[in-house]
């Protein structure tokens, strides 16, 4: 949800939905998938009421750094700070994921995970997340199911960019592992172990 507000730019999912909405279940696209952005306080309250002691969510690269590199979106920083603080106030442990299949479209246009430039941009994004939120977030995941973009996007045509090419899939797998390693290195260099 909240796909086109507060400075967030297009991810591959926004682009793909715009191009082929029929590929999405019941034609439901990024704009309508979640109300968490607007209702996070109520959602976190429900987490607490139902006995949850932790919550894993993701920081959207296309929201935090809309152009993939460079300027940080302050509205995104405020949103993620508010979510983290609300979780902590409610004794719910924040667990942050850095990539849940949502490549910024501007990074996909540079080759996505096929591009070493995108690997380096991801490491910089991860470092910025650690710097901004690492004072309160102690549990990080670099990638959600890292094999899915490889298989879905480059072998079996169920994720964007819908390619079927084993060589390119291998490159994407390698660069995903490299991006993981580089982001862990950034984390360790910040002394946040």
Regions found by a protein language model. Give the residues of each.
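Glycine-rich, proline-tolerant flexible connector loops at the mouths of alpha/beta enzymes
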Residues: 59-72
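Aromatic- and Gly/Pro-rich amphipathic surface segment
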Residues: 10-45
